[in-house]
A protein has these predicted regions:
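Basic, flexible Lys/Arg- and Gly-enriched helix-loop patches that mediate nucleic-acid binding at interfaces
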Residues: 1-168
Length: 168
């Protein structure tokens, strides 16, 4: 026998098991210039302006600063959001970072090493060159923590001028 979740009432130990709620999941390509918040007291553009027609209240899973762009997940599924954000799950986040000039081997080695950021020692990052020329280098940087402005602070501590940051 099988149950029809649309018509059958299912009970376990006297508790009715209902249908799972239909959750909403959005993959947003956040542009630069928007803050990752639902409202902003300073009047800056918010990501809610980009998702007006969703019809449900969703929340961002993590953050991207105003000057970063790229993948931002929004959902009304708190369990899913927690699985993605909680540090114990060590979810890998990959960014493309553009820095001025050619990136030296020493700078790459430094980026791959742990950093002290706001009193917290980060885990080593995975760093690869995507493209390099005299004017700029495009890097792929994968991290597991996602501390506040972590990639920006890593580049700053390495002496690199970050010009663009995109989560992929």
């Amino acid at each position: 026998d099988s149950a029809d979740i649309d018509t059958d009432i299912i009970c376990i130990d006297g508790q009715t098991i209902g249908r799972r709620a239909d959750n909403t999941y959005i993959m947003l390509n956040k542009p630069r210039g928007y803050v990752t918040t639902l409202s902003d007291e300073k009047g800056r553009p918010c990501i809610t302006e980009l998702i007006k027609d969703v019809g449900k209240r969703v929340y961002p899973v993590g953050r991207l600063d105003m000057y970063s762009e790229g993948l931002l997940i929004l959902t009304d599924d708190g369990d899913f959001a927690n699985r993605l954000m909680h540090p114990s799950h060590e979810m890998t986040k990959t960014y493309h970072a553009w820095v001025n000039g050619k990136c030296s081997v020493a700078a790459l080695d430094r980026l791959r090493s742990p950093f002290d950021i706001d009193g917290y020692k980060t885990k080593p990052a995975e760093v690869e060159i995507i493209y390099s020329c005299d004017d700029y280098t495009q890097l792929s940087i994968s991290i597991h923590e996602g501390r506040n402005r972590q990639i920006r602070k890593m580049c700053e501590q390495t002496g690199l001028k970050l010009t663009k940051l995109k989560r992929v």
